[in-house]
Structures are given as C-alpha cells and as structure tokens.
C-alpha cells in the first residue's frame, strides 16, 4: 500500500454552512432557476476601473451624464446589507468592482440577494456612479444569481494558510490569493514573449513526439508506459533533443519547441516530475552564439514582461542587464578549491582523493569528468548568484555535446546558473556520427553498470547523423525556473498550476 496524505475533513461549522447552501440550491431547483446559462457579459471590472480611474474627471455627475450601462458577471467576494440599500463586491478575471444595490430599484432581486452567499457567481446590469469615498460602483438596475457556491471560501483575513492545501486546491487559491493569480498571468506572458522573440528571428515552432521508442536527449530516468495495440513499451520523453536535431538534418535550420518533459526523479522545491522546457536548435551556430542568444532572450523577456531587468529571487537581488559572466568549469572548481591543481582536474585518482576529503559520495564507475562535476556541484554551484555561464564540461557528462578542438576531454558546452540554480543548458552539437555512436555505447555500458540515468543507444539517430547535420548550436531553458526567477517564487510548486502531490486518501 502506498503512503497517502489523509483527505482534510471540513470542520463541523463548515459542514453546517455547506448544508445551508445545499438547501438554498434545492429551493432554486424547485423554482427552475438553479443554473441559468443565458447571460451575455459585455464588460470587465479591470477595464472599467482603468477607463474611469480619474475621480476628478469622472465625478458621480459625470458618470451619470455619460449614460454608460454595463453588463458584468463575477464571483461575489463581499456583501454588506444595510436595510433598503446594500453594497457588494464582485471579482472577475480582470479585477474587482463594487455594486450599489437598492431595494426600491431591484425589488424581488434585492430580497433574493440578501440570501446569497460570498462565493456565489452573479450577473449585474446598471449604470456607473461613485460613492462618497470615491469608489467606482455599478448602480444595479438588474441582478441575478448564475451559480450557487456550495462550499464557503476561506476566511478573507487568513486566506489559504496551509501551503499544501493551496497546491491541492489551486482553484480556491486563485480565487482568494491575488498574488497567486498574478504569478500565472505572468507565466503566460513570459512564454508568449519568448515565442514572439524567437518567431521574430525566423525560428520555427514544431511539435515532436511525447512518447518515445527509445528514451534520449538527456541523462535522466524515464517514465515507462505500454501501447496495448502494438504490444510495445514506450517512454514519456525526457527531452525532445534527438527529434529536433533530426529536423535540422532535414533542413529545418532554426527550430524550437516549448512543451513538457517527464523525468522519473525526486520532487523538491526545484524539481517536478513533469516540467516545461524551451528547447531550440540553430544550424551554423556555435555555443558562443547560443550563449549570446540565451542571455538576450532572458534579458528581453524580463524587460517585456516586468518592465525591468532587475529582480529579487530567494533573498538575492539579480541584475540581468550586465553581460553574463562566462567561466570554465575547471577554473571555477580551482577558484573555490585552491588545493585542486590544473593537473588534478583530469586526474581521476587525484579527484577521488579530493572527493573523499570533501566528503562527496561517489560511485566506482565515475571517471574524472563525473568526479569534477560532483566537486563543482558541491562547492561552486550554490555560490553563483549573478548570472553565470559555466562552460566547457567534461565529455563524460556531456554525451551529446561537441568535443573541444583545443581541450581534450572537454566539450563546447555551457550551463547558465542564477542564484545557485541551473536555468539553461546548451552546447555546440555533436554531429560526428562515429563519435556519437561511441558515446552512446559508453552510455550503454554505464547503464549496464547500474546508472539508471544513462542514455540508450539510438540507432536511428545515428542514421540521421550519417546523412549529415550542419554545425549546430542547441539550447534548453527551464521555463518553470525562469518563471520562478521573474516572479520571485522560491518553490517550483508556486509556478505550476497543478504540481505533483501525493494522492489524498
């Protein structure tokens, strides 16, 4: 039996409130008006608030003289009944607006309103006015209930204080937490801005398979599934890389995809089993040019969405305007570990001794490249606060990257780190089919040795390379982490509408 989180039980007073609301719904059913669907909305709260924001120009008299009549709908977020007149507040996707309700104008609808509950969805029609406190209001001439809410919203002063409940019941979180709603609006704008940036530079958006015959494109453990009709095991993709590079072989020289990847790995504040990636490839580009592209698309996206290139993320003030630092991995390791010499960086036995001294656990199968990466992750990664490209990774940990022409054992690869977190990974692509086949074979041997994240041998991809792939640069940007950066979110779950959670019992 798998471990499950117990389903939260509503308190007794909440149960009684639900029972009362169900009784009200029963009365509406008896009248045949439980869930009407004939109201046509014409106006939004946010648009009205923006249009009539100037209280000096739009006085109550000016609003009445305008003759504007609005038809709106939204969720009832507050109500204040005061005898013959009442106030209410409704919320739609754009914001909130106040309603001014009069019994002598609304008649039976006003009587019905007194029995409505916060959370109900209502429709209103009327003119515009402004209260003595200066608040824009809809002076209702017609009012009706569209949807009866059966569950009470959280207390307005405390909201959803249970973080896990916020993630499980995102639909409630979006209703009562404006900050959460704003994060997901920004997420949409970020993705839209990146698409526009790439489209303007002649990149072609494509769609590649989500289920793969052979998992590949990244060193990660895949999810498996089974196609019944074909009696065939398949894998949810860990990355679209090998399919996108097949398209470059086919002559689509600038391609990108923004879509989901799936990796059967741990869950943390930075990791979710399914996540969104931007992956792109450009023929005749080197990893230096791809670093330039990475820097510019992130900087321009921030400016487009936020209006600034300065952000605060998890306690750090980040400036995206200056040129991003570029630092070789071995140099960064030596800078933070003066006892490691240049010769040590490619000496397996020396690196093993350093790992032992640093209390870094390693496996017997690790070569010097993997050991160097382990030391980097343990001693350097968390120190990279301002945007930094770590470059020239060892071949051992870069099975798809082009080998360096000047540094044996290293590759033309980079990773971008901001505030100790990896946001992007790219390289000059390996387009030598014989070298690629040899690296695939090394990955197969690593898998046979117990490395669950090692790649499989993809013979069809080798065949594609044998037709010839132009010199190419590639890039992957973690959209979820980029959204975290640009919204100041500290957990990946805060930028995923429905993050992975253990099922409720």
Swiss-Prot record:
How many and how are cofactors bound here?
Answer: Binds 3 Mg(2+) ions per subunit.
> What EC number(s) are associated with this protein in UniProt?
6.1.1.6
One of its Pfam families is tRNA_anti-codon
What is its cofactor?
Mg(2+)
Gene Ontology biological process terms from the UniProt entry: lysyl-tRNA aminoacylation
Q: Which reaction does it catalyse?
A: tRNA(Lys) + L-lysine + ATP = L-lysyl-tRNA(Lys) + AMP + diphosphate
Q: What is the enzyme's main class?
A: ligase
Superkingdom, natural source: Bacteria
Keywords, alphabetical = Aminoacyl-tRNA synthetase, ATP-binding, Cytoplasm, Ligase, Magnesium, Metal-binding, Nucleotide-binding, Protein biosynthesis
> What family is this protein classified in?
Belongs to the class-II aminoacyl-tRNA synthetase family.
Q: What is this protein called?
A: Lysine--tRNA ligase
**Which species does the entry assign this protein to?**
Xanthomonas axonopodis pv. citri (strain 306)
């Amino acid at each position: 039996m798998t471990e499950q989180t117990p389903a939260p039980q509503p308190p007794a007073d909440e149960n009684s409130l639900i029972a009362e609301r169900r009784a009200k719904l029963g009365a509406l059913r008896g009248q045949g008006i439980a869930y009407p669907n004939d109201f046509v909305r014409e106006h939004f709260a946010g648009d009205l608030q923006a249009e009539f924001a100037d209280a000096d120009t739009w006085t109550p008299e000016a609003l009445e003289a305008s003759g504007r009549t609005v038809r709106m709908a939204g969720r009832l977020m507050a109500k204040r009944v005061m005898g013959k007149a009442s106030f209410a507040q409704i919320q739609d996707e754009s914001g909130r607006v106040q309603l001014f309700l009069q019994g002598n104008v609304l008649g039976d609808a006003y009587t019905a309103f007194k029995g409505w509950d916060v959370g109900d969805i209502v429709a209103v029609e009327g003119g515009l006015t402004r209260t003595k406190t200066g608040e824009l209001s809809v002076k209702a001439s017609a009012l009706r209930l569209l949807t009866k809410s059966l569950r009470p919203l959280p207390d307005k002063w405390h909201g959803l204080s249970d973080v896990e409940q916020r993630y499980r019941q995102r639909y409630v979180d979006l209703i009562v937490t404006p900050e959460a709603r704003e994060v997901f609006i920004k997420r949409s704008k970020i993705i839209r801005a990146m698409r526009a940036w790439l489209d303007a530079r002649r990149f072609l958006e494509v769609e590649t398979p989500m289920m793969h015959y052979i998992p590949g494109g990244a060193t990660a453990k895949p999810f498996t599934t089974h196609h019944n009709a074909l009696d065939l095991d398949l894998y949810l993709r860990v990355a679209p890389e090998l399919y996108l590079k097949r398209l470059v072989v086919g002559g689509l020289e600038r391609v990108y995809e923004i879509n989901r990847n799936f990796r059967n790995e741990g869950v943390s504040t930075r990791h979710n089993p399914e996540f969104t990636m931007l992956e792109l490839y450009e023929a005749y580009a080197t990893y230096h040019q791809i670093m330039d592209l990475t820097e510019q698309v992130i900087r321009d996206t921030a400016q487009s969405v936020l209006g600034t290139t300065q952000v605060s993320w998890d306690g750090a003030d980040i400036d995206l305007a200056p040129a991003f630092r570029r630092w070789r991995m071995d140099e960064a390791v030596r800078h933070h570990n003066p006892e490691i010499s240049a010769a040590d960086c490619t000496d397996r036995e020396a690196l093993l001794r350093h790992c032992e001294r640093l209390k870094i656990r390693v496996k017997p199968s690790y070569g010097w490249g993997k050991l160097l990466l382990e030391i980097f992750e343990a001693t350097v990664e968390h120190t990279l606060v301002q945007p930094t490209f770590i470059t020239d990774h060892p071949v051992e940990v870069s099975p798809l990257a082009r080998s360096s022409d000047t540094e044996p054992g290293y590759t033309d690869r980079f990773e971008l780190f901001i505030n100790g977190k990896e946001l992007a990974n790219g390289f000059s692509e390996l387009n030598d089919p014989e070298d690629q086949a040899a690296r695939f074979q090394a990955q197969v041997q690593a898998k046979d040795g117990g490395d669950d994240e090692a790649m499989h041998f993809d013979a069809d991809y080798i065949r594609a390379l044998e037709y010839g792939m132009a010199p190419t640069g590639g890039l992957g940007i973690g959209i979820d982490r980029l959204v975290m950066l640009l919204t100041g979110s500290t957990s990946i779950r805060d930028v995923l509408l429905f993050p992975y959670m253990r099922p409720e019992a």
